[in-house]
A protein has these predicted regions:
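Amphipathic alpha-helical segments within well-ordered protein domains
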Residues: 12, 46-49, 88
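Short beta-strand scaffold positions
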Residues: 6, 39-40, 78, 98, ...
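Residue-level detector of structured alpha->beta connecting loops
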Residues: 32-35, 72, 95, 111
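Alpha-helix capping/helix-boundary segments
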Residues: 10-11, 44-45, 83, 103, ...
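Short, well-structured N-terminal submotif of metal-dependent ribonuclease cores
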Residues: 1-40, 53-66
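Acidic catalytic patch
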Residues: 69-92
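Acidic, PIN/NYN-like endoribonuclease modules and their adjacent C-terminal/linker elements
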Residues: 1-3, 75-76, 104, 108-137
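Helix-loop "lid/cap" segments that line or gate small-molecule binding pockets
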Residues: 51-52, 73
Length: 137
């Protein structure tokens, strides 16, 4: 079964109905039909949540978070030694954000494709690490 790793920017694109939202929606619909699996690290979900809190009242952000958690997305709240070491390595080597290091490490360790639009962060990494990118735009 195909595995995707959800980056915060991809989920935010869906929530904001930005360019690429249709790609994210299609992937989530496929997961609803058990055609693929989606994992999102809790560090990336935190990025989504704090963006929601900044944009709306906390009660609205909490409601949207609950809706996200009802989608067919497995939230990984664990930091295995393998994820820990890979995230630290990637953050140091590429000077990326803390949360982005977890998304990349999750994708690299699990072999899943990272659903993202973060070209400014990840273009330098594509082709240099064993990470597949699923660009939404």
């Amino acid at each position: 079964m195909k595995l995707y790793i959800m980056d915060a920017c991809a989920m935010l694109a869906l929530l904001r109905n930005e360019i690429g939202a249709d790609v994210v929606a299609d992937i989530i619909n496929a997961a609803n039909n058990n055609k693929l699996k989606i994992i999102m690290h809790k560090a990336n979900l935190l990025e989504v949540y704090y963006d929601l809190v900044r944009s709306f009242e906390k009660s609205v952000a909490d409601k949207i978070l609950a809706e996200i958690l009802n989608r067919p997305i497995e939230v990984n709240s664990e930091i295995s030694d393998e994820i820990f070491l890979e995230a630290g390595y990637l953050k140091a080597k590429y000077k990326i954000s803390f949360a982005d290091s977890f998304a990349l490490a999750q994708a690299k360790v699990s072999g899943g494709a990272l659903i993202t639009s973060d070209h400014h962060e990840f273009d330098i990494i594509e082709g240099k690490e064993n990470i597949e990118f699923a660009w939404i735009r």
